[in-house]
Amino acid sequence: MQIQPHPSGALLLLLLSNLLMWENVASVPRCIMENGGCQKVLNYLFNMTSTISESFNTLSSETLNDFYTEFDPHQTFQNRPAMTCHTSSRSIPNNKRKAERMEPAALLNVIIRMLASWKNLLYHVENNMANLDGTPYAIISKVKLIDRQIKKLTKNLQDIKTILSQVHPELKEKENYPVWSGEPYVQKSKRRTQLFGLHSLFFCLYSDAEKVSDYVNILRNKIVPNE
């Protein structure tokens, strides 16, 4: 039985082979290959990425609301600020206007960096909610879905980065990723302190998911406009 290659993988390989033929081009600000080349492959990748990022945003919002319903019925945490999110940084734009002013290569790295900062999300949730009173299983199930979405988003964006790095060498540089700083809170034996840490985790996740969804669409408009 002959195994057929996955369509997205075949398209990506075809594109990369084409890119190798014109990698000596000094500067290509936008992917402009015609007749089914770069534009179509990037548009295909962005279609998938946009859909997943919207689902990521929706699920993160639902997870935060589930947390409020299950563990904060009196709005104790909703009426007080969460701890500073671990992804808060001068290099990460905090609104769409700032993101729109960024160069595509820089914005792509920002999105990948934000997603990588949540690579241990499932570990934190499973480890720190298992002993809480209540029924956190619905929340944990959604976090498992979110974890898979983060991995898919990262894979798609890395594929886009592979393509664009042919004309944007700076994209090949490795990034350092911030890690969540709330672990000391959720490891406390006091339930209220644990819940404060988990509230901050889910609030920051929701905030970042919203940004990722917005920034993916901004990036798409910069790289494959009018598609």
UniProtKB/Swiss-Prot annotation:
Record's keyword terms, sorted: Disulfide bond, Glycoprotein, Hormone, Secreted, Signal
Secretion signal span: 1-27
Gene Ontology molecular function: hormone activity; prolactin receptor binding
Top-level taxon of origin: Eukaryota
Glycan attachment sites: 47
Protein name: Prolactin-5A1
GO biological process: cell surface receptor signaling pathway; female pregnancy; mammary gland development; positive regulation of lactation; positive regulation of receptor signaling pathway via JAK-STAT; response to nutrient levels
UniProt keyword Secreted, yes or no: yes
